[in-house]
């Protein structure tokens, strides 16, 4: 059993404040939620289990029991998960406030310990102090946290997480912030708490405390598209698709790390809870992470033979050709922007090949085909520029005054002509490597200008950010028929 979950279950009975703050979905009646196979720690109840996606940020960080309350660490309501979540620079004072909150919600004194022990001994065969019967008393106060970085903001979700060596498929990593705090002071707090326990339980408490307070922090993970709900990923190829999220909100102070101090003033805490409400947001999928996913899928479906073909149709409209036909059944082609990029990139590359290399049919096998594998994935800038350079070198460029040039005298479509004029000011007859890079960047940036995209989706924004964007409004994309340039 998860220690934190057990502690919340037993301690919520001691007073009104605890009954409100320590209420967890995992300790209440179970309500079904979408089953998944993502393994990790539920941020709400701290148990290691199968996770489902959060309705507030669409990431997998909540168990199927706790999902019924829809709590997210990015909420603006002072529930326990939010009060345990700290942001960016964490000071020693912040950590002391956190320790005070733990001590307030999970007090340890002789009266409390005797009460729990007496209640437990009322059951048969429970006269011995076995750990499974007193798990709720064996939760030490530590600075163990699960941390994540979202577009420059670092979040620390403190709690007591058992079995740190278990499989973790979430983007959260274990970070120990004890170096910021006074170790001796934290030791003293826990030794004082431990002194009220029976001797047989003190050893287990000490082992748990030192194992969770002296561990080495993990390397912070990178958030990827696989960490978000499969429902979102399956709809990325619909340009008009919007992600629906809900956030628990209240009139909480803008002092993010100060939320944990609310439990010291019970009346103020309950006054804030009276303002609690749910806010709904419809946000765009637009971000580098999801854009890269779409472009990578299209790259895997690319038919490079089109570069040497004589087809009059655009690359995605070629049918009944063994070497050039694309499989139109893939949902990535539902996004007309991906189709436009695919068509224009191959149209431009075909013009380069036809202008410089003596090839005549799409059935021919050319070395240049090996260079286009990453040509759409501009999000990985280093690999992308390497691919463009390799393609340029395959065109047998001519050196003049230490600069390499290739010819450009083959027809292109009107879309590419417009991009040529916009990017380099004219329709040229010779091109340098820099010209080719600029033109190909412009073809992709016309629809997906990653230079101005955030890395993660807007579902990872705080409530304050979402509210500001709603006022402007920028929570939804532009009309689906308008490009980034327009």
UniProtKB/Swiss-Prot annotation:
Region (Interaction with host IRF3): 317-486
GO molecular function terms attached to this record: metal ion binding; RNA binding
Gene Ontology process terms (BP): symbiont-mediated suppression of host cytoplasmic pattern recognition receptor signaling pathway via inhibition of IRF3 activity; symbiont-mediated suppression of host cytoplasmic pattern recognition receptor signaling pathway via inhibition of IRF7 activity; symbiont-mediated suppression of host NF-kappaB cascade
Positions of region (Zinc-binding domain): 42-79
Swiss-Prot/TrEMBL keywords: Host cytoplasm, Host cytoskeleton, Host-virus interaction, Inhibition of host innate immune response by virus, Inhibition of host IRF3 by virus, Inhibition of host IRF7 by virus, Inhibition of host NF-kappa-B by virus, Inhibition of host RLR pathway by virus, Interferon antiviral system evasion, Metal-binding, Phosphoprotein, RNA-binding, Viral immunoevasion
Motif (pLxIS motif): 480-483
Domain comment, as recorded: The integrity of the zinc-binding domain in NSP1 is important for degradation of host IRF3. The pLxIS motif targets host IRF3 for degradation; however phosphorylation of NSP1 pLxIS motif is not required for its activity.
Record-given protein name: Non-structural protein 1
Organism: Rotavirus A (isolate RVA/Human/United States/WI61/1983/G9P1A[8]) (RV-A)
Phylogenetic placement of the source organism: Viruses, Riboviria, Orthornavirae, Duplornaviricota, Resentoviricetes
């Amino acid at each position: 059993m998860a220690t934190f979950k057990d502690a919340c279950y037993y301690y919520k009975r001691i007073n009104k404040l605890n009954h409100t703050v320590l209420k967890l979905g995992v300790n209440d009646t179970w309500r079904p939620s979408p089953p998944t196979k993502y393994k990790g720690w539920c941020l709400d109840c701290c148990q290691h289990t199968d996770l489902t996606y959060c309705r507030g940020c669409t990431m997998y960080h909540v168990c199927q029991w706790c999902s019924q309350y829809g709590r997210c660490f990015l909420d603006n309501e002072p529930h326990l998960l939010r009060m345990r979540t700290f942001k960016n620079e964490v000071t020693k004072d912040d950590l002391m406030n956190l320790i005070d909150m733990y001590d307030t919600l999970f007090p340890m004194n002789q009266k409390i310990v005797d009460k729990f022990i007496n209640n437990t001994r009322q059951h048969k065969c429970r006269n011995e102090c076995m750990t499974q019967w007193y798990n709720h008393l064996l939760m030490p106060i530590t600075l163990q946290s699960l941390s994540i970085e979202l577009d420059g903001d670092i979040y620390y979700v403190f709690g007591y997480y058992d079995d740190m060596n278990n499989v973790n498929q979430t983007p959260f990593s274990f970070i120990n912030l004890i170096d910021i705090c006074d170790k001796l002071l934290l030791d003293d707090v826990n030794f004082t708490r431990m002194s009220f326990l029976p001797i047989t339980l003190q050893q287990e408490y000490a082992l748990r405390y030192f194992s969770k307070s002296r561990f080495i922090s993990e390397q912070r993970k990178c958030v990827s598209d696989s960490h978000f709900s499969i429902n979102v990923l399956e709809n990325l190829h619909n340009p008009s698709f919007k992600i629906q999220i809900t956030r628990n909100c209240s009139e909480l102070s803008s002092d993010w790390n100060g939320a944990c101090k609310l439990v010291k003033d019970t009346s103020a805490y309950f006054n804030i809870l009276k303002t609690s409400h749910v806010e709904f947001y419809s946000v765009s999928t637009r971000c580098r992470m999801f854009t890269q996913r779409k472009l990578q899928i299209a790259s895997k479906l690319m038919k490079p033979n089109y570069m040497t073909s004589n087809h009059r149709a655009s690359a995605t409209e070629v049918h009944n050709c063994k070497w050039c036909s694309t499989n139109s059944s893939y949902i990535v082609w539902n996004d007309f922007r991906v189709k436009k990029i695919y068509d224009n990139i191959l149209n431009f590359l075909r013009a380069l090949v036809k202008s410089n290399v003596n090839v005549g049919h799409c059935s021919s096998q050319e070395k240049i085909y090996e260079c286009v594998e990453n040509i759409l994935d501009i999000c990985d800038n280093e690999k992308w520029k390497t691919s463009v350079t390799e393609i340029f070198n395959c065109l047998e460029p001519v050196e003049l005054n230490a600069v390499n040039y290739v010819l450009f005298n083959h027809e292109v479509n009107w879309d590419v002509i417009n991009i040529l004029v916009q990017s380099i000011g004219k329709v040229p007859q010779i091109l340098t490597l820099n010209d080719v890079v600029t033109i190909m960047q412009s073809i992709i940036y016309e629809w997906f200008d990653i230079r101005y995209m955030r890395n993660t989706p807007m579902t990872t924004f705080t409530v304050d950010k979402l509210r500001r964007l709603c006022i402007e409004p920028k929570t939804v994309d532009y009309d689906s028929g308008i490009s980034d340039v327009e």
